[in-house]
């Protein structure tokens, strides 16, 4: 467990350590810290894997109108910076990315505020050179844990 916690903590605290590198496709957030204003929030629990271990995770989503504009991931007491929604031209995923140089990214299956509590997540990763390093994978909705959250 120490090894996994160390990886998660490193990924969430690398904003100052990793240089910003150009991605294959530029992703422009729908909102950023300077213009962030949400109407409501929804917290969802997931069960993810890494190194054949199951790790619980929660994500707090910020909602503006009928759009999910920001996500904040919590794993083992560590909280990510705001991960801002970026458009996916193919509408295959909901993509949330850090506005800082660390390139932390959270992806989920397509969801709206109305379907968040019924939709599986995907991967939590961070930029490592020219590719992404996966922190948590196969994040599945944990309905029982989600039901216990204060929403």
Language model features by range: what are they?
Residues 93-151:
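Beta-sheet ligand-binding and adhesion/scaffold domains
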Residues 23-86, 128-151:
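N-terminal secretory signal peptides
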Residues 17-19:
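N-terminal signal peptide c-region/cleavage motif recognized by signal peptidases
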Residues 75-103:
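An exposed acidic His-Trp-rich patch
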Residues 1-11:
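Bacterial N-terminal signal peptides that target proteins for export
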């Amino acid at each position: 467990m120490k090894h996994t916690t160390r990886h998660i903590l490193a990924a969430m605290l690398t904003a100052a350590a990793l240089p910003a590198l150009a991605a294959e496709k530029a992703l422009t957030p729908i909102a950023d810290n300077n213009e962030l204003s949400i109407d409501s929030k929804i917290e969802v629990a997931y069960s993810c894997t890494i190194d054949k271990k199951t790790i619980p995770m929660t994500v707090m989503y910020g909602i503006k109108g009928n759009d999910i504009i920001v996500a904040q991931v919590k794993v083992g007491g560590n909280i990510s910076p705001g991960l801002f929604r970026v458009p996916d031209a193919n509408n295959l995923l909901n993509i949330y990315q850090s506005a800082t140089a660390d390139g932390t990214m959270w992806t989920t299956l397509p969801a709206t505020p109305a379907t968040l509590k019924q939709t599986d997540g995907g991967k939590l990763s961070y930029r490592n050179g020219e590719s992404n390093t996966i922190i948590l994978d196969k994040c599945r909705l944990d309905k029982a844990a989600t039901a216990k959250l204060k929403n």
